[in-house]
Regions:
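An acidic/histidine-cluster motif and surrounding catalytic segment
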Residues: 1-78, 82-266
Length: 266
């Protein structure tokens, strides 16, 4: 499978990191190609209400999806803050083996889940799957999600994906939210692999598109905790200085206790 990663020409350090990371975990049959990202200046005059940086991001992903039309098989499209581990590529292959090619258009390998309830469900599912060493595909048709750091485009339906995204409409939603809209409206079929086969590198802590705030830090920590090869201490470090109010901290302890093997449902 080919990985197409999106990268601005001036972001040399990000490019070098992606290429070193891929070289360290590469498996037979996998390749890596760079997609030259569209700049905010080049996207400025495109119609739509979103910011110029978001327009540029949208057009960069479209450029990658267009290139995917000519690939030999499925393509993993990634931003240049994607992180691969030793088990990432085998995990992707294992997940693909578990779903018929006619049943999906896009498979995410990492996502933002912005709401606490579904976030907890994902975490508990990851815990269960870690014990069995398996993975599970979650249908995104009715789920609130965001992010487009890494996702696989089905070679059988790639034309459909491109046509849905490049329909000539003004760019009024960021790329990830447009994907979510298309999936929730059943125009595209999207799933996410759990545990997440990929994660985000340290570059994700300094977004090129939006300012980082507490919500971003929480979502990034969740993504790293749901990763197949998570490092709990590293994932939580950016949140170490956050002080929870007493009630929230107490409730968090209840949830922690419910994760114990000694906790039995009645």
């Amino acid at each position: 499978m080919d990985i197409f990663y999106i990268n601005l020409a001036k972001q040399i350090h990000r490019r070098e990191f992606v290429e070193r990371n891929f070289a360290a975990v590469r498996r037979p049959g996998w390749g890596l190609s760079r997609i030259d990202a569209v700049t905010a200046a080049a996207a400025r005059d495109m119609p739509g209400r979103i910011k110029d940086t978001e327009k540029a991001c949208f057009q960069s992903h479209l450029r990658a999806v267009e290139k995917a039309q000519h690939a030999a098989g499925h393509v993993l499209i990634a931003e240049d803050d994607m992180l691969l581990g030793e088990g990432s590529l085998p995990a992707v292959q294992g997940a693909l083996a578990g779903i018929a090619e006619d049943d999906w258009d896009i498979l995410f390998t990492d996502l933002i889940i912005p709401n606490a309830g579904p976030m907890a469900n994902f975490y508990m599912l990851r815990q269960r799957l870690a014990l069995s060493g398996g993975s599970q595909l979650i249908d995104l048709g009715n789920l609130n999600f965001a992010g487009a750091t890494a996702y696989i485009v089905n070679h059988r339906t790639r034309r459909k994906v491109l046509q849905a995204l490049a329909d000539g409409s003004p760019l009024d939603l960021p790329y990830d939210l447009q994907l979510r809209k298309l999936i929730r409206s059943k125009i595209l079929r999207g799933h996410v692999i759990v545990p997440f086969p990929t994660s985000v590198s340290a570059f994700a802590d300094t977004s090129q598109i939006q300012e980082t705030n507490l919500a971003d830090a929480v979502w990034t920590a969740f993504r790293r905790l749901t990763w197949l090869e998570r490092d709990i201490d590293a994932a939580m470090k950016p949140l170490a200085i956050q002080k929870a109010e007493p009630g929230a901290e107490a409730f968090a302890r209840l949830l922690t206790a419910m994760q114990s093997a000694d906790y039995k449902k009645k």
